[in-house]
C-alpha cells in the first residue's frame, strides 16, 4: 500500500481534521473501496451503487440577531458555554434550506420573527466537525419568548456586545462583522 493510500485509509490526510469517513455504503451495505476521483484524491467509493461517499460534517446556522435600536440578542445556554454568551444557532434539518433554518431557530430560541435575513460568511468549526453558516437576522425589538434550551437572553448595545462573547469564537467573529457593517 502506498504511503498516500495508507494515510487516507487512516484518516490522516493532508493535515486535515479526521472527519467521519464511511467504511460501508449507507445505501446497500457494501464495503467501500478507495477510488481516485479527479483532483479530490482517494475517496471512499461504492462499486455496487457507483457513488463516492464524501467526508461528512454537520451543517449549522448561527445568527447575529439585531434590532432597530442597534442592539444584539445574546443568549446564555449552559450546555453550550457556562462562561460566555452565545448567538442563536442550530442544526439544519434534512430538506431545509439554510435561510429557513436561520428563521426557524430565531423563532424557536427567542420567539421573534425575522424581518430581514442577510448571509454574512461560513465558519468551519473543526473542533465539532461542523460548518456554521453565519447570518445577520434583523427583528423588531420585543420581549423574548425563550425556548427551554435557552437559559436567558438579553439585548446588548452594539458597543458592549463583543466583550460579552469569547474573543475569537465564531459568535464573536459574526457579531463583529455585523456591527462593523461588513
Task: Specify the residue positions occupied by each region the protein language model found.
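N-terminal leader/linker segments that precede catalytic domains of diphosphate-processing enzymes
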Residues: 1-80, 91-143, 180-182
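A short, flexible beta-alpha/helix-coil linker loop
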Residues: 80-81, 161
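NUDIX/MutT-family hydrolases
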Residues: 145-176
Amino acid at each position: 500500500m502506498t504511503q498516500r493510500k495508507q494515510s487516507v485509509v487512516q484518516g490522516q490526510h493532508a493535515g486535515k481534521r479526521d472527519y467521519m469517513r464511511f467504511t460501508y455504503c449507507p445505501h446497500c451495505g457494501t464495503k467501500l473501496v478507495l477510488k481516485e476521483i479527479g483532483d479530490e484524491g482517494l475517496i471512499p467509493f461504492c462499486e455496487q451503487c457507483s457513488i463516492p461517499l464524501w467526508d461528512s460534517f454537520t451543517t449549522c446556522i448561527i445568527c447575529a440577531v439585531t434590532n432597530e435600536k442597534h442592539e444584539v440578542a445574546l443568549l446564555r445556554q449552559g450546555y453550550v458555554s457556562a462562561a460566555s454568551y452565545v448567538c442563536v444557532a442550530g442544526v439544519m434539518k434534512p430538506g431545509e434550506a439554510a435561510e429557513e433554518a436561520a428563521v426557524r431557530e430565531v423563532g424557536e430560541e427567542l420567539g421573534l420573527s425575522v424581518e430581514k435575513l442577510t448571509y454574512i460568511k461560513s465558519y468551519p468549526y473543526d473542533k465539532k466537525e461542523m460548518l456554521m453558516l453565519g447570518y445577520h437576522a434583523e427583528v423588531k425589538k420585543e420581549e423574548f419568548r425563550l425556548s427551554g434550551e435557552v437559559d436567558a437572553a438579553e439585548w446588548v448595545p452594539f458597543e458592549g456586545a463583543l466583550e460579552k462573547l469569547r474573543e475569537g469564537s465564531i459568535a464573536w467573529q459574526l457579531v463583529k462583522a455585523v456591527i462593523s457593517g461588513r
